[in-house]
């Protein structure tokens, strides 16, 4: 097998090669061992692994898995019930979404999802560690009703250190971004609905920071689509209705174990002519 390098698509032998990753960087330790920093291809997880634990994914296997991923997105969209509108003439304004994504490929796929759902969404590929620095300005520019803060995350080592923010790869950046968004919100009285988090994110701290929905209560992996499902449901729910996870729990990969929250007021506005 050739030497693994940045940009390669790999899986981890120690995890039975269950998840496909892209190698983002390779670190050389003082004892000459090499550690790869990995980002999930179809789940929002960031991880690391010794080079010797990695297996290169063949082109055929990669194409097969990517096809399965695309089909999963299409199937998830197809399962969403069609909303029956009143026979009266009406103008429907769904909530406007601003989506910040730390992963470029996920950002591109998110645009596709929102378009297929007919939603008004702006998607920006912003690295997790820069999201807090730009969110206030972006909120000022786009004035959304719903904010999605996501990308990749993961617990670093001891799975028992649930309450140590330093044991999470990107939760601290998501937390800072939520706080910045709430500063904007309080100043402008927008009543912004916020989803924040990715795989294994520090759920409690994200909620304390001001998120309405967040991941991951059980510190499990979440699906690429889970943040988008939350945003979509808030966007298409009438502004007179309060929406909770129970209203769309079946659309989430692992239900309340992956995503939960306090709920929020819907953002759809219907004007009858």
What are these regions (language model features)?
Residues 2-5:
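Short, well-ordered loop/turn sites that connect or cap secondary structure elements
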Residues 111-122:
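Short helix-loop-beta junction
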Residues 139-153, 211:
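Proline-aspartate-enriched helix->loop->beta-strand connector
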Residues 17-28:
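Short beta-strand-centered aromatic/proline hotspots
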Residues 29-39:
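Short, solvent-exposed secondary-structure boundary/capping segments
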Residues 218-273:
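C-terminal functional extensions of proteins
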């Amino acid at each position: 097998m050739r030497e693994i390098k940045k940009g390669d698509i790999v899986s981890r032998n120690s995890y039975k090669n269950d998840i496909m990753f892209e190698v983002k960087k390779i670190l050389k330790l003082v004892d000459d061992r090499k550690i790869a920093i990995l980002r999930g291809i179809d789940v929002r997880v960031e991880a690391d692994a010794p080079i010797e634990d990695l297996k290169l994914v063949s082109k055929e296997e990669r194409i097969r898995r990517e096809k399965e991923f695309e089909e999963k997105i299409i199937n998830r969209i197809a399962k969403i019930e069609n909303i029956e509108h009143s026979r009266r003439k009406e103008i429907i304004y769904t909530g406007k979404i601003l989506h910040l994504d730390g992963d470029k490929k996920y950002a591109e796929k998110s645009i596709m999802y929102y378009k297929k759902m007919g939603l008004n969404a702006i998607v920006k590929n912003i690295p997790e560690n820069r999201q807090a620095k730009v969110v206030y300005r972006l909120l000022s520019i786009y004035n959304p009703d719903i904010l999605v803060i996501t990308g990749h995350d993961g617990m670093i080592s001891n799975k028992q250190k649930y309450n140590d923010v330093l044991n999470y790869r990107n939760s601290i950046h998501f937390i800072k971004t939520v706080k910045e968004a709430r500063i904007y919100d309080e100043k402008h009285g927008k009543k912004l609905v916020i989803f924040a988090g990715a795989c294994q994110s520090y759920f409690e701290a994200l909620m304390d920071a001001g998120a309405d929905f967040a991941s991951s209560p059980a510190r499990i992996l979440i699906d690429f689509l889970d943040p988008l499902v939350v945003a979509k449901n808030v966007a298409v729910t009438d502004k007179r209705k309060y929406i909770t996870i129970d209203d769309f729990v079946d659309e989430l990969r692992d239900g309340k174990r992956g995503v939960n929250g306090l709920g929020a007021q819907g953002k759809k506005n219907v004007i009858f002519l």
